[in-house]
């Protein structure tokens, strides 16, 4: 619950889409300083307040509404399929914390192969992510000419020339964590 998914059409030889996935939730946080200041010891009574229940302790009433603050947390990712025009995602980029988008080749290779393949270069994707102020970028859908980590280095280098956020090269089966703060972390096998 709390998920919202929307689609945006992309530009490719066959129908292709990007999906914006947003998760919002209400978070309750105890005002610990106020509870200590009003002499309510930490323990099960705090749990009752956290659950929204008023507490009566040593002749004093502790209304949950005075000690529990609610705020909204959200995470938002935009995941694109085949696309030669990253700017098509402009309208969908509001609030996005991570963009997963193809960078099939470097701009030099893109210029050589021409427009027909209808894929984005690392430069195009990085420029869009920078312009849209998206803090994290995951590049994916690499041409077969980039067949190992060393061969992928020019894609990463090109992206970093045009984008100054966190950049990752997608790997099969890799997992990441996106925190409400916008921090984007690769997970190790033990974290997953």
Regions found by a protein language model. Give the residues of each.
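A short linear-motif detector with a strong N-terminal bias
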Residues: 1, 56-59, 77-80, 117, ...
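Active-site-proximal loop/helix segment associated with metal-binding centers of metalloenzymes
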Residues: 3-79, 83-91, 98-100
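Binuclear metal-ion centers of metallo-dependent hydrolases, dominated by the metallo-beta-lactamase
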Residues: 85-192
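A short helix-to-beta-strand connector/capping loop
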Residues: 1, 74, 163-166
């Amino acid at each position: 619950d709390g998920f919202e998914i929307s689609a945006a059409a992309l530009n490719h030889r066959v129908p292709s889409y990007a999906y914006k996935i947003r998760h919002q939730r209400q978070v309750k946080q105890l005002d610990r300083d106020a509870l200590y200041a009003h002499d309510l010891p930490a323990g099960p009574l705090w749990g009752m307040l956290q659950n929204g229940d008023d507490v009566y302790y040593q002749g004093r009433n502790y209304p949950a509404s005075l000690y529990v603050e609610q705020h909204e947390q959200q995470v938002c990712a935009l995941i694109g399929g085949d696309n030669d025009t990253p700017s098509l995602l402009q309208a969908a980029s509001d609030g996005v914390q991570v963009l997963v988008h193809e960078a099939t080749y470097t701009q030099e290779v893109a210029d050589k192969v021409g427009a027909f393949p209808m894929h984005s270069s690392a430069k195009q994707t990085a420029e869009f992510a920078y312009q849209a102020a998206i803090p994290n970028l995951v590049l994916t859908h690499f041409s077969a000419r980039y067949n190992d980590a060393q061969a992928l280095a020019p894609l990463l280098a090109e992206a970093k020339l045009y984008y100054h956020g966190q950049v990752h090269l997608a790997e099969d089966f890799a997992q990441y964590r996106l925190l409400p703060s916008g921090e984007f972390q690769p997970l190790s096998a033990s974290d997953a």
